[in-house]
Amino acid sequence: MPRTLVTNCGEAARHFVGDGDYIAKAVVSGGFRENGRRYAIFTTPVTPDDLPDDAVRSAPVIYQERIANRFDLRVTVVGERVFAARISIPDDDKSEADWRAVDPARVAYEIHELPPALEAACVAYVKAHALVFAALDFIITPQGDYVFIEINPSGQWGWLEDATGVPITDAIVDCLITGAA
């Protein structure tokens, strides 16, 4: 996992990001409305100059070391079932800190086979947090290393089904019907 800090203290945030290559992202994804328009909040590069106290204190933010990536990976765990989807963007879009900020027509999705040990670790991690469902995000580095970024206990999955055909909804229904975890 990259170096990570969650804070709403400007001094702590500035000290943490220092001279390094860091990103900032919302603790809760979403967006906001202004003048009748909806805006998304994406992960963005950040420097100490971006973090005056008054801009940081209103809500906690996740600050994380930026990791070079070959592609992103969303791993959805439902009970004992694991679905992994590779999320790729063209090299000329790699300057974006968040693939969601890239033109959706340029984002490619495909089913990804996890190493068995990582798949088992994902299931164990979800269970250790007393969850039956969770979405785990990883970055795959240019060297092929898997770097865990975060776990989301209410991660979206419909878009992955649409893009790859993975049967996440069926797995959730099975879990609900059987009570299996």
Where are each of the predicted segments found?
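Hydrophobic anchor at the start of a short beta-strand
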Residues: M1-P2, Y22
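A short linear hydrophobic-aromatic micro-motif
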Residues: R3, V61-I62, F133-L136
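FMN-binding flavodoxin-like domain, especially the glycine-rich phosphate-binding loop
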Residues: R3-T7, E11
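Phosphate-binding site of ATP-dependent enzymes
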Residues: G10-A12, V17-L114
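Generic enzyme active-site microenvironment
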Residues: I23, A135, F148
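C-terminal active-site "lid" helix and adjoining low-complexity regulatory extension at the edge
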Residues: E110-P116, A120, A124-L131, I140-A181
